[in-house]
Amino acid sequence: MSYILHLGHQPTDIAGISGLLNTTAGGFDPTLDVNAIRHVGFNSYSAPFSFSVPEPVGDLWLGFRYVPPNADANSINRAEASFLEFYSATNVLLAQIKPITTTNRYHAIAAGDTSAQGSSSYTAPNGQPQWIDVRVAVGAEITIEFYVEGVLQSTATAANANGKGKPRHVVFANTALHGISANRTWYYAHIAALDGVSTIGRRFVRRSPNAIASFNQMVGSIDALRDGDIATRVASTAAGQRMSFSLTGPTGPASVSAIAGVHLKQIAQAGTVGPDATTGFLRIGGVNHDAAPETVPDLAPKPVYSSWAVNPADASPWSDLTLPNEVGILSA
């Protein structure tokens, strides 16, 4: 089972970002992806976006790259300002990262039986790219920790005797993040949510389908997989059908200390007839290495993640020399 709860910042599985993808240099890391989510607005600007995750077994970790507003990010003058919010399955607020007008800093807030606000050392620097990591733990207590570039900036803990559930909805509140009535520009990119695994220092390279490879057994064109449009799809009429493809896109930083895993993400939905499960596979040296299948609903599409912590061909650690050049999807 994959520890991946969510990967990416594309509109296929994030609500509220249609039309906001942008390729301006500096908004994203070009070794990891090809675009970012860009916002432009006054200090009253509010444009939340969000995604949901399966219930985590462990703590929820959220990591992403943030470029604060290009001016006046260090001035917070509206009480409704909010950066991040975490909700339970029943939409009860669990925790929050909130810029506060009295300090101009981003504070961690745990919303348990009472609300607890932590002190903070973080003021957003104008237009300076940085990596944000947040840990949310829910049990007898609710704890939230807020990190910037791996350094803890704010934390808060509150009792949870009323038994609020684990985080299921992540909301980028994205409200009133600078302090002037003039347009400012800011960016989000490379979003990852992990189950019980720290996002600190982890970077995910997104590559996309390029061309059909060894298998083309499904109905539809590979264009439906590479266009980024959830409305265009391929279909399988029988269990065991495969479609495989080469990959295109960034290849990652020039130098990395280790590759922790390979993950294949698909967004799938069962039909009224035919197979109702899917999985991903890697093809290495002419051999298919299938992940465990996952049943998908027929009501609406859902993300399915297949993960390999090591090279399945020989159980060796991944390196940039052994990463697969061909991957695919398999109906089951």
Please give the residue ranges for each predicted region:
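Extended, low-complexity, turn-rich repeat/linker tracts enriched in Gly/Pro/Ser/Thr and Asp/Glu
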Residues: P68-S75, V138-I142, Q266-A277
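Short carbohydrate-recognition loop motifs
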Residues: G19-S52, R226-G240
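Flexible glycan-contacting loops in extracellular carbohydrate-active proteins
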Residues: A156-Y187
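Short, aromatic/His-centered strand-loop micro-motif at the edge of beta-sheets
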Residues: H107-W131
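Disulfide-rich extracellular domains of secreted proteins
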Residues: M1-A15, A176-A332
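Secretory/extracellular carbohydrate-interaction modules
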Residues: G41-Y106
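Short strand-turn-strand beta-turns centered on an Asx-Gly dipeptide
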Residues: Y147-V151, G285
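Localized edge beta-strand/strand-to-loop motifs within extracellular or lumenal beta-rich domains
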Residues: Q128-T143
